[in-house]
C-alpha cells in the first residue's frame, strides 16, 4: 500500500465505519490537532457520506498549546470556561459520537510546571464530569485513533534524518496495528474481536477473586470485585449501536478492587502523561492504595498524577495483553499509551469503567464505590507486562490457575 491517498481513505473508512460506526442522522465531534488535518478531511467527508448530520471539528495547534502553557498563569491556563462545558454537554445530550485523533508529541509539555499541568487536569476532570460519565458508561459512542506528527515520528524513529520519511514510517506502522494493511480490514477486525471475546469468556467463567502478577521488579496481587465482567473489543452505546473505543486494541479488561491491591509493580514501557515522559518508576500498594512511589524520569509529573484526587492512587482497570501481539512484535516503542498499552499487560490508576461490573451502569457513584469500583476524575494506563511476566488467577478457595506464562496466554 504505497499510495498516500489510498492509505488515508482506507484508514478513514476503518475509523468511521468500525471505530465510531457513525449512524445516519448522528452528530460527530472530532478532537484533533492541525497535524492530523490530512486524515481529518477524509474522516469528515466520509462521516457526512454515511449520513452524519453535523461534523464538529475541535482543532488545536501544538505550537500554540505549548505557548499557552509557557506564558499563561496557572489560574488562566487551568480555567475551563462555562461555554466550553455547555457546548460539549449539548452535543453529548444529542447522541454525538466522539472521534479523537492523537498526533501530539509525547514531549509537548516537557519542562512546563507540573503544578500548572496538574491544575488543568483536575479542573477539566471536574468540569467535564458529564462527559466522563457518558464515555465511561458507553452512553455515547467514542473511538480513539492517531496520525503521526513530525515531532512524534522523530521520537519513534530517532535515526531517520528525513522527517517526511519518519512520518511515513510511523503512518505505515499505525496502519498495520489497525489492520488497514489487510485485504479486507473489516473481516480482519471481526476475526480479531472473536478471538478476544473467547479470552474474555474464559476469564468470566473462572470468576477469579484476584490476579497475582510476578516478574522482575513486580510482585503484585490485584483483587477483583464481586460480579466483575471481563470485556473484549467492542461496545454498544445507549441506543444499541456497536463501536470500537480504541484503534488499535489487543486487550481484555475488567475492574480492579479498589481496596484489595497489595505489593509492588514497575513499569516496562515509558508513560506519556500531560506532554511529559514518566519512566523507570515503581509503585507500592497497600490495601489498594499507592503508599510509596519512585521514578527516575518524570517524578514530579507522577506525583501530580497520584495527587489528582483520592482515587488516582488506586487501580481502576486491569488489562491483559499478550507479549506475542502485533504491536509488541513490531519492536517499536510508540511513546503513546494508545499503542504501548496494546503491547503489554497494563493497569490504570483512577476511574474504573462501570461497564466492567454487573449492572454497574445503573449504579450511583456511591453504590459503585461500595462495590469496590474505583472513582476518580483521572484514568491513566501504565504498562507493566514483558516476556517474563507470569499471572495466576486465584479462585475463592485459594486455588491458583495459570493465566499468563512468560508474557503470553497460558490457556
Regions found by a protein language model. Name each.
Residues 35, 104-106, 149, 218, ...:
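Short, glycine-/Ser/Thr-/acidic-enriched flexible segments
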Residues 13, 204-206, 274-277, 311, ...:
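Short solvent-exposed loop/turn micro-motifs enriched in small/polar/acidic residues
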Residues 260-262, 278-280, 287-290, 313-317, ...:
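Active-site lining segments that contact anionic ligands and/or coordinate catalytic metals
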Residues 254-310:
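Long, well-ordered mid-to-C-terminal structural blocks that present hydrophobic/aromatic surfaces
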Residues 366-411:
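Extended hydrophobic packing segments that form well-structured cores
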Residues 1-262, 399-401, 409-411:
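Active-site bordering "gate/hinge" segments
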Residues 210-213, 281-284, 387-396:
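Short polybasic amphipathic segments
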Residues 292-361:
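Dual-mode signal for accessory low-complexity, basic/Gly-rich regions
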